[in-house]
UniProtKB/Swiss-Prot annotation:
Its cofactor is heme b. It comes from Oltmannsiellopsis viridis. Heme binds at H20. This is Cytochrome b559 subunit beta. GO terms for molecular function: electron transfer activity; heme binding; iron ion binding. The keyword Heme applies. The gene is psbF.
Amino acid sequence: MANQKTYTYPIFTVRWLAIHALAVPTVFFLGSITAMQFIER
């Protein structure tokens, strides 16, 4: 529970993969919706 940049546990990698696995499709989904809105108008 210390504020040190330790790479002993792979939690950082799993957390990074989880964040990107959720963020990338979300950004793509929002971008496609925005494109549909601009194309429709």
